[in-house]
Structure formats: C-alpha cells, structure tokens
Amino acid sequence: MEDRRNGIFRTSNGELIGTKTSGRAVLNERTIPKDTDKVRLMNYFNGGSNIEVLNFWNYILAVSAGECRGKEFDGEARKAINMAIKTYTWHFLLVPKNDAMGYDITTKMQAYAPSYISENKKVTEDMEAVHNVWMESYKGAIFEANYVAGSKNSAGKSKSGRLLQNGCEYMIRIGRCATCYECLHYYYDNSKASNG
C-alpha cells in the first residue's frame, strides 16, 4: 500500500521501477492478462463489421503500431503510450464495451493495424520493454486510461486522465520527462481516472 500511495511502479515480479513521487497513480499488484488471453474486437470496415478474437499480446502490439507510426515515438514516448494502450485494453476486458453483443472493444476506440508492425522494429522492442509493467488507480482498479493524439509540440494538461501521444513525444524530446513513467505520472496522477 505504501508503494501505491507514493506512486511507484512495480513489475509483475514486484521489482521497483522509477522513483517515488507525490502523485497517486499506478502500480501493478494483481494477476496481469496473459499474452494468450483473448480480446474480442468489433472490427468495422467498408460499412460492415465482424468480431475478431485475438491474443492480447498480438492485439496491443498492433494497436501500438496503428496509433504511433512515426519513428519519433520510438523509446520512452512509445513505452508510455503502450502502457496506456495496455491499461485501456485491460479495462475493457474487465468491463466489455458490449458483452451482450460479444465484444470487448472496437476499432473505433483503438487503431488496430497489424500490417504496420513490420514498418518499425521498435514497435515490438518498446512493447517488450514494458511487457510486465501495468497501471492501476490509487484504489487498485484497472482504469480507463484514455489517450489521444494531441497536438505537436505541446504537452497538454497535466492530471487530465488523458495521455497525449504527441505530448509524450514532445516532453521526452525537450527533456521535460526522462522516462515513460514520468509521462504517465504527468497525465494520470491525481486525475479522476486514476483516483477511482
């Protein structure tokens, strides 16, 4: 509990990552989804739709590739974005978007693009770097870790509960944040999303 109150990140093995902060975000002390757990994706295309059942790892990797195609995101910025992608997806595995219709999440919610993975080998490397690290709210819930593109060269609002992809890239590039964890604290600490 002390770790969570001080905003420390831990791996699934309990190892500390990052440093203490005054913020109250995010920590993993629960069973995390297995790479082979299933994501039921409502895939909209050409006016039609179908439900695809995908492995969790394959899904989040394809979303990372689809959300951030530029190499400027490689490294710490993409790692922060990957943490948001994983937490957001996990939230909808626990609270499906439409369980009655048989799906957890939709292509209108996340940019699922498996064909883009091969464009940049850093997509896989950056996801593997945060493979066993997760976020929880201050109260231990898996929260809806919202994220959007945001504007170039702007960090956006801190404690908003919504990570800006371009904001992460900007803060890392100018040295405002040195690690993905600092980006995550910037957006999620003491926000409505992470306090619940």
Describe each PLM feature range:
Residues M1-G196:
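Conserved, single-site charged/polar hotspot
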